[in-house]
């Protein structure tokens, strides 16, 4: 089963705490797109999109969309004061130069070495990898938000990814409906429990070794 609305929002709310004042932020589609809803009103950050916008704002009301202004997923957005526009060459130059402070992405699998697989399910048609490869390699911090298991109940946190990789050794932090984990020295490190989950439950639903670094653990 997929995640419910409340679980998706809780993950996004926790991910929002990783964004700090003055950051340049890039968000993937799905749960990452919910993150701006949970930022403090006084938070001064700039959202960047691969299609060439720095300074993306909230979604417009129905009927107020600008046909020439959208995010990388093609959804209408507003621009904030001070926003700038540029071609995709400049956009990816920003990414490859390491100008993105944090990217928040979805995932199909993450390995204990921080490898990320988030673009291809064998047998399904997909448009391509998009900008995730560059973002995962070059952003200063990579946060993954996802369900802890897939729709068949199989762990998505694994010893080794079995799906085609987006990038190797890139993930810093993972937030699921069960837990918050860091990746360090080829291990998952359990930092927080979510939704009343237990250490035993998280361990059972994770297909790799977990080290525990929590208060009173």
From Swiss-Prot:
Q: Which domain of life is it from?
A: Bacteria
The answer to whether keyword Transferase applies is: yes
Q: What class of enzyme is it?
A: transferase
EC number assigned by the record:
2.8.3.-
Q: Where are the transmembrane segments?
A: none
GO MF: CoA-transferase activity
The answer, when asked if Transferase is one of the entry's keywords, is yes
Question: What InterPro entries does its record include?
Answer: 3-oxoacid_CoA-transf_B, CoA_trans_fam_I, NagB/RpiA_transferase-like
Q: Name the UniProt key words of this record, in alphabetical order.
A: Transferase
Q: Which residues form the active site?
A: 50
Q: Which SUPFAM superfamilies match?
A: NagB/RpiA/CoA transferase-like
Subunit note: Heterodimer of a subunit alpha and a subunit beta.
The entry sums up its family as follows:
Belongs to the 3-oxoacid CoA-transferase subunit B family.
Under what name is this protein listed?
A: Probable coenzyme A transferase subunit beta
Give the source species: Bacillus subtilis (strain 168)
- Upper lineage: Bacteria, Bacillati, Bacillota, Bacilli, Bacillales
């Amino acid at each position: 089963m997929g995640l419910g609305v409340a679980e998706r929002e809780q993950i996004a709310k926790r991910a929002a705490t990783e964004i700090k004042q003055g950051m340049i932020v890039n968000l993937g589609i799905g749960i990452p797109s919910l993150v701006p809803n949970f930022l403090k009103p006084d938070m001064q950050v700039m959202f960047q999109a691969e299609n060439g916008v720095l300074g993306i704002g909230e979604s417009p009301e129905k009927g107020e969309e600008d046909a020439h202004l959208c995010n990388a997923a093609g959804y209408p957005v507003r621009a904030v004061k001070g926003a700038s526009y540029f071609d995709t060459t400049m956009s990816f130059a920003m990414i490859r130069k390491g100008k993105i402070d944090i990217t928040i992405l979805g995932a199909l699998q993450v390995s204990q070495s921080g490898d990320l697989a988030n673009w291809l399910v064998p047998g399904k048609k997909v448009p391509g990898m998009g900008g995730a490869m560059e973002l995962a390699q070059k952003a200063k911090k990579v946060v993954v938000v996802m369900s802890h298991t897939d729709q068949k109940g199989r762990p998505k946190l694994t010893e080794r990814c079995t799906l085609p990789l987006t990038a190797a050794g890139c993930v810093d932090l993972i937030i699921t409906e069960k837990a918050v984990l860091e990746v360090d020295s080829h291990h998952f490190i359990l930092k927080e429990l979510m939704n009343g989950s237990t250490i035993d439950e998280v361990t059972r639903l994770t297909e790799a070794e977990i080290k525990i670094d929590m208060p009173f653990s």
